[in-house]
Amino acid sequence: MSLTSAPESGLAPLEFAVSRNLHTKSDAERAELLVDPQFGTTFTDHMIDVCWSVGGGWHRPRVQPYGPLALDPAAAVLHYGQEIFEGIKAYRHADGSIWTFRPDANGRRLQRSARRLALPELPVEYFIQSLRELIAVDGAWVPSGADQSLYLRPFMFAKEAFLGVRPANKVGYYVIASPVGAYFKGGAKPVSIWLSEQYARAGKGGTGAAKTGGNYAASLLPQAEAYEQGCDQVVFLDQDRNVEELGGMNIVFVYKDGTLVTPQSPSILEGITRDSILQLAADRGHKVEGRSVSIDEWREGVASGDIVEVFACGTAAVVAPIGVLKGTDFIDEQPLGELALSLREELTDIQYGRREDTHGWLVRLDG
């Protein structure tokens, strides 16, 4: 289930023009913001902007001050949703160096998303270079507190101005960054899950495997329903009542024989955190499977003791144990074990440089 591929070769690097922000935060202002950063509310001083056009390819790469984008009201993204994005973090290690985790996998996933949304495929080298270019000017924004990081958000959208259903001839690729703190204050806590049976996240042959905004927009109403039911997150089923994923995280079941099973389907986003967690589990000798898991197998497995642990995983939370599954006519307490949190600790230790990276997952962004 590895998502990592060999990088493309033979590409000359982009030559970024750098326009410095003349109104950057002072060291004192930035330090205050980094004390307890909230997810996605504070942004660094600069951003990446790269253009693409039919015939012109990728061109005019720039590092520029963070600020509003000028869009024509007829920009295709506003009408037809031709948009994709990624999420990846930069970590400050104890020696002050700045690293990221499996950026080649994120770059490949962005390419798959682009293919599905009829957008141009950004070379993985350019993807990684764009992260390095932003860190070169905004590296001071990478926090050093426990479980803190700089969340990097690459995204791409159709910006050609026209009305008509066709792939756009002009596209923009951007990267912005936001310092973030620990997802769970005081350590990872079990989350409660609402079973959505009225709504679907994605359909067969649809865009479920792409990281595109429409999938997340479709999850907002059922997520609101989950909140109304007193739950933290929502889990979706496919048309055959097989478990798919949460609104923004993959799900993993741990069976009493030590096997880890994760739902596998063309309509599920291939999670890089999930792939890494499963690799670490396999390194420990656990059997790992990707297959369909019905909601009945989940509930009956918990009731019989065959399933001994259930957890969700993703870039933001890393790993979140699932403590409760709630439906319209049931509330199932979920068994809590030690494996999820043990794997979470191992993964974050690798990301922050506290444990040896035997898989070559870390890539340095500074220096």
Give the predicted meaning of each segment.
Residues S2-V137, S149, F155, F162-G367:
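Helix-start/capping segments and mature chain N-termini
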